Amino acid sequence: MSEFRKIVERILDEGDKKIFNKNGPHYNSSKDEEGIFELLKKKYPNAVQNYTDDRFVSPITHRHFQLDFYDPDSDTGFNYNKHIRHGRRKFDKNDPNCLKDIKWLESKAKPDSLYEKILHTWRDVDPIKREVAKQSGLKYIEWFNIDEFLKWYNNPELTYEEYKTAPESMQYDSDEYFKQKERHRDVYGNDTDYLGA
């Protein structure tokens, strides 16, 4: 097993321990999501966690997409896309950096590999979610790290382009991201934040 693969597997094992907080009120929620939910409830008192809606269905698989959080009063869905499968920012098929990242991921992707899963989620699934949300009239907000959430939370009128904090290229992840994660640091957000990123 390559050293890179060992690092990835250790990161994923550690992530599973954090993501699936069996003692929390919401089984499939990370500590970050629990903290985000607490803050969202201050602005959106009727918000719920782990929500599905008949308007928010994949036209390909006909399965419901899940929202991490949903506020019925403003009809707003929120997703916290911290996992690497979602990339580090929104995929844009017209962005040269995204296209370079796709080529880079494709060069590394093998069947059932992490790179293939990133391609599938970041390039294929997440853009469909955005389009389905738009077509259904659902206001849809995403964050890719805790700093983006906090920046948006303090200025909710900001657009994604105004509150994003991730680097332009995912290729940064090829070495530095996994090295930093191995040292238990979140290179895209504040590694000492109270939400446990």
Where do the PLM segments sit?
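Nucleic-acid endo/exonuclease domains
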Residues: S2-H184, Y188, A197
